[in-house]
């Protein structure tokens, strides 16, 4: 049974990539440029050429997009795996010479003709000088390993270290770490043992976070606590009752969640909505009550399809979370003191993005409501530490049949990390 080998697939891929870059640079004089989405590509090979040779990835992405449009939500890990298997082409044994000829023809169609191909190599390398202290500090910073998540494994640290930009001594474009596999392992282990990193678990594959990310989560917990019992966006009884009458099909527990969200006065509140629990229907009832009380209700979700689904189900204006994150100019924030922002599928929201949204709400006097299902999205457990300050808030747990209202909230990072 070779399945245990796959446990090391991510780390092995990072090491192989680092060694390949090292040898291509030292032996052939290749230089590198940032990839379109992530990683690095050989400088001189355009994104069009890369796309031409990424047909398999494009097929998977197209199939996933079609599935998500059909089901109205993001695909779960199991569904992604099914798509990967379903779109796998049959084996086709083509002679090597024919393959190479085909590759050259495809590259030439996008401008990578023989002369340009030859120009990719032969660059003189002055050798890469790595300031380890600066590298570790940068990797542990806001734009580093925790830029999109809160915790990471050693395998993920290897990937991040291999792909982190290293400033060039001559002032030219930064390059990836060009040290080879063995040195990559040494640097990664030194980073994990550095003052910038905190070990969270002691399992076979430990989890880590950064001191900087703990600071982000401290801000989240502090803002959550400060936002309790603020009398924020309170909705009169008659508007809540009218909304519940219009949504008479709601269960008793769902009705209680509507009341809690509309009448507790917390600036920040969260709920866990299990699959099939009718969370958007519950949100629609809340939106009716808030709107009747004169508040402006907006919606958001991480993925575009989830955003469209939320808008269609609730009738509120919705944008992606990314849209809000690029509208952070203090002079033109999209929220104001009469706004309530509802974030659907909040379990896909990173702590860093949550921190930004909470700061925006606190600055403008808006309120924030989060609802999602960590189990549905395969979310990683949050870094809890001593984040009990947020435990005094309220969280509803929406089950497929009923809504179970918990008397105390888990820490906000626990929902969204």
At which residue positions do the language-model features occur?
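Conserved ATP-binding/catalytic motifs of P-loop helicase motor domains
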Residues: 1-417
